[in-house]
């Protein structure tokens, strides 16, 4: 079976790469988060399952008697993605796969701001605690990937409490 892990960028068909779209159209089974499955192009197979845990996905793929399957992820498969855990699980299970990366949120934000991002420091505050003041004190632009309890508002509040309230913050949301 051909297994393809696909980054869906902002989660809409418009942010799929051509290779990602081709892999989706050729898949007989598509797995991923429910919100992503709901956004798939209409031409994709209706055989879909809302799974996002690596072990559950591996178990479903092992018992699938099909030629091609796809697993979708929001953002880019290489930027703080659940794809990394799935890659480890697929490797351990001996299941071969390919990866089609998507457009990351940092790329989408940089494009919206008309700014290059090669000098930005990239920090994940998604589902984990972080000290934004310590990160921002080096003077470089910082991109925080947020989620869970670490929202843009909580990061800005922490900056203000750390005497860094003069730091300019830009929030990118629903970029796709």
Language model segments and positions:
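Short loop/edge segments at beta-strand edges and connector loops
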Residues: 101, 124, 173
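Class I S-adenosyl-L-methionine
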Residues: 1-103, 107-108, 127-131
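Hydrophobic side chains in well-ordered alpha-helices
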Residues: 82, 109, 154-158
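A contiguous loop/helix-start segment that scaffolds small-molecule binding in enzyme catalytic cores
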Residues: 2-5, 18-19, 66-69, 138-176
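Generic secondary-structure signature for well-ordered alpha-helical cores
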Residues: 29-32, 114-118, 160-165, 174
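Short, glycine-/small-residue-rich phosphate/pyrophosphate-handling segment
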Residues: 105-138, 147
